[in-house]
């Protein structure tokens, strides 16, 4: 199983196509000579200096170790004029030109995306009336996020039931492109869900009241307005509540494989190696995608198009259109909270069916639920002064420091949990936020492994059959709606998640608490 790319030390990579630019060696990699004066390598990051892109308001920073740095330089070297997306380095610099920006950052898992890189973080100061909110800085899957449930089961308890459990989960939780649930929501229910989020499920007896405590924003963002969500978006979400979707979304049954911080793990109810957990990764489905598309279209048609990159076109946050997008985005985010909550309901019911014990008896408590595609109003210290900001996190996880008032009381001594999913067949991690992260990254860390090669290139270079076979060899029960697409999510298509989380720890923006390995993977 090969992507055609093998990481190596100090490797000089040749361009895919001839580029008529003079090249220069930069820390063992070749880059266009014109870029070199504006790049600085530290032991944990790449600094992109003002001037790399005309109009940059300040330096930008990308957290990376040596191997991840190589990938960034390779992408910069090979970027082509007229391509759909610029290189991740250029996108991070582009964001530093936006009105009101305090700093543009990229996490170690960053890769090119629409407007912002996926893994991009940027805070805009709200004392600047021109500070923008940018749909391309949130992404199309609004409030894509991850939640982790724990159990009191061990791997030895679950091993005899792996195939049965995998089949039942695939049956009970629809996944794949355009999949629908058995329930079609009424207009009234849609409005309630987009307003109340996870609270709606609690009222219906489909989620536990304590789930609200262990969910970012308590599972409901107050400043939302469902009436700003178009009928087209509503139509796409009406029958998708409780569905996984496709792409990198998944449901995994995992075992705790290693505990690095026993005290922090204990606070989360994780006590020993072999303990079984459930990880759910999904977002707002077609509804969120359409909300983003509607407001991208609005921004481009009604605003001055961004001269650096049209994909970065946004609107002033405090303008009427800025507030409309923000409130519609929050409505979609509430739908995503409810979606993950509904999937959790089906997971709890499935475990009860297979193990003949109630979810309460199985200790199926929510450890935490995090967002990683969202923009939020927050306050951060900037040059010693507390500044109100709108913080964009696109493929990045909020990871606030210990004692922060917005995190649950149980986690105040350790910091906000940040759940980091690895590529299919590899490990995942639980991190917590740090005080240093509040200073360096607006309380943000990575969100996953991050793509190394595109889906198209993965399908060209990796055999889906070999991916499925490799999962079998690892003893992982894989349930995938379309096995022909398995190559898109192959391990070789992604960066090494271990390198990503260790880079975050080395940079001081988060700490590793424990590692999980998959036993069952359910994908679209």
Curated annotation (Swiss-Prot):
Q: Where does Mn(2+) 1 bind?
A: 141, 144, 249
What domain of life does the UniProt record list for this protein's source? Eukaryota
Q: Which EC class, in a word?
A: ligase
Which parts of the sequence bind Mn(2+) 2? 144, 281, 372
Recall the GO molecular function terms of this protein's record. GTP binding; metal ion binding; RNA ligase (GTP) activity
Catalytic reaction annotation: a 3'-end 3'-phospho-ribonucleotide-RNA + a 5'-end dephospho-ribonucleoside-RNA + GTP = a ribonucleotidyl-ribonucleotide-RNA + GMP + diphosphate; a 3'-end 2',3'-cyclophospho-ribonucleotide-RNA + a 5'-end dephospho-ribonucleoside-RNA + GTP + H2O = a ribonucleotidyl-ribonucleotide-RNA + GMP + diphosphate + H(+)
Q: What else is known?
A: Ligation probably proceeds through 3 nucleotidyl transfer steps, with 2',3'-cyclic phosphate termini being hydrolyzed to 3'-P termini in a step that precedes 3'-P activation with GMP. In the first nucleotidyl transfer step, RTCB reacts with GTP to form a covalent RTCB-histidine-GMP intermediate with release of PPi; in the second step, the GMP moiety is transferred to the RNA 3'-P; in the third step, the 5'-OH from the opposite RNA strand attacks the activated 3'-P to form a 3',5'-phosphodiester bond and release GMP.
Q: How does the annotation summarize its subunit structure?
A: Catalytic component of the tRNA-splicing ligase complex.
Q: Which family does it belong to?
A: Belongs to the RtcB family.
Tell me the protein's name: RNA-splicing ligase RtcB homolog 1
